[in-house]
């Protein structure tokens, strides 16, 4: 009797491709007097969750520039390129005006971003954010151009439920509160 075993080589892996999402946003930010209808194509990295992707979309909506004469805010390739943020606003001479991170980057990454951009924003959303922040807060005292926002876990998870391959999202901001609606 002959036994045949098929063994897969654990070192051979296939590169997974990004999943493409389309989003059409309607922005009404009454606090900043910004009204826009940007459309975007989102290349979602295979390891990126719905929650993280939608926090990137939220960050884009909350930071859309009122004046696009100095360029626009764009989704960057932070999951593929270690030297890029989640989003950035670059002017036409390639200067980084606004560097936006999502999640829980380390203090070195944030300090490097503060040195490269005029303004840096971080949108943290995981339930472990308070513990993470207590570990790096004192290391960021020199980062005067850094603003950190914490999105409550329940809200970021609710935002993730709006994920669809093709999305139509309305963002309304008034008195410091953001409402997000998918029309359903």
Can you annotate each of these PLM segments?
Residues 2, 7-49:
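Extreme N-terminal leader/targeting regions
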Residues 23-27, 87, 177-182:
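Short polybasic amphipathic segments
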Residues 31-79:
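Acidic-basic catalytic patches of nuclease active cores, encompassing PD-(D/E)XK
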Residues 76-78, 90, 100-103, 123-126:
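Short His-Asn-centered micro-motif
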Residues 81-91:
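N-terminal active-site wall of soluble small-molecule enzyme domains
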Residues 87-89, 96-113:
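Conserved catalytic cores of phosphodiester-cleaving nucleases, focusing on short active-site segments
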Residues 117-124, 144-148:
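Hydrophobic beta-strand segments of well-ordered beta-sheets in folded domains
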Residues 132-184:
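Domain-level recognition of nuclease-like catalytic cores that cleave nucleotide substrates
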